[in-house]
Amino acid sequence: MIFRCCFEGCGKSFPRRAKLSDHLNTHTRSRPYKCDMCEKSYMKNGHLSVHKKKHFPPELACERCGYMCHTRDRLHKHQKACLEYKCGICGKRYRKRSWFDVHVESHHVKVFNAPRSKHVCEYCKFEFNKKSNLSTHVRSVHLLMKPFKCPCGKEYAHNASLDRHRKKCASWSYPGLDVAKPPAASNSLL
């Protein structure tokens, strides 16, 4: 069954009565969908649903920069503009982590493989007593790599930083491990 708009000159049709009802509100300027948490009202139920999410912390995060939002549409728009992976050596920017990693490995990998008796950073001349410490320094300071990842999406250059974060993060859990989690939100704040 098709549901047609009865307003003169409109002629739009809809597959469901609810969609027609929402459409009619655009003609009458009626706003029957009211938020039960604030005073805002909307012509369409879908707009109210999007609004209600704003009363709660955002759940969607950009994997590149950590930007948080409420809707997939907003996240998609953000990700189109987000060029968060920037090379700390040459300044090139990449939209995808995999492209950034390929760039680093193909253009700057000599830093990790150069034989030397002293372990000196080629970029800032800082000296290290171990090659592994130099590699960690270059990756985290100059290449801005963060290989240690939490299930919540945050990334860290050092495992110790991830360990500190893990003690506070509610997303981190393994069966059999007693991991400290933040206290539950109080209902009195709502």
Curated annotation (Swiss-Prot):
PROSITE patterns: ZINC_FINGER_C2H2_1, ZINC_FINGER_C2H2_2. GO terms for cellular component: nucleus. InterPro entries: Znf_C2H2_sf (IPR036236), Znf_C2H2_type (IPR013087). Keywords: Metal-binding, Repeat, Zinc, Zinc-finger. Gene3D superfamilies: Classic Zinc Finger. GO terms for molecular function: DNA-binding transcription factor activity, RNA polymerase II-specific; RNA polymerase II transcription regulatory region sequence-specific DNA binding; zinc ion binding. It comes from the Eukaryota. The keyword Zinc-finger applies. The keyword Repeat applies. SUPFAM superfamilies: beta-beta-alpha zinc fingers (SSF57667). This is Zinc finger C2H2 protein ECU03_0790. It comes from Encephalitozoon cuniculi (strain GB-M1) (Microsporidian parasite). SMART domains: ZnF_C2H2. Pfam families: zf-C2H2. A zinc finger (C2H2-type) spans 4-27, 33-55, 85-108, 119-142.
